[in-house]
Amino acid sequence: MFDCAIKNGTLVDGSRKKPYKASLYIKDGRIAEITADDSKAARTSFDAAGRVVSPGFIDMHSHSDCSYLTVPTHEGKLVGGVTFELVGQCGTSAIPLNPRNKADTLRYVSSNFSTKFDPETFPATDFDGYASHIEQFGVS
């Protein structure tokens, strides 16, 4: 028996093949089978008829560094299919935070978010602090 089944979806698999109807069967956290057969047993089953099933998307240039400090679930990314996000590479990241520019940097970063970051209570100023905060509070 499979752990999970996603049945009757339109599969877009990233291989440049045309989308096709299929059922995915998952065992031990991995896709074990992709088939047109939707009759196989699974502990949990989802009907994906009328929906697209695809691998998760990678966001290679985002500005979500600080978002994860205030909204760790970040549902918007998940709803859009993003399952991996690279942060901190654009030059406007708040991490690492130069102590001399802390107030100005946080004011600038806050201008892009509904949350205003207080320089006195900002939870992370270096990579270790950021990683520790993310580890403690988690992300989706």
Where is each model-derived feature located?
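Flexible loop/turn segments at secondary-structure boundaries
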Residues: D13, D65, T92-P96
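Short glycine-rich, polar/acidic loop-and-turn segments at beta strand-coil junctions
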Residues: D28-R30, S62, Q89-G91
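Divalent-metal coordination cores built from histidine and acidic residues
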Residues: T70-S140
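Di-metal (Zn2+ and/or Mg2+/Mn2+) metal-binding site signature of metallo-dependent hydrolases
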Residues: V52-G76
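Histidine-rich, glycine-flanked metal-binding segment
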Residues: M1-A5, L11-G56, V71
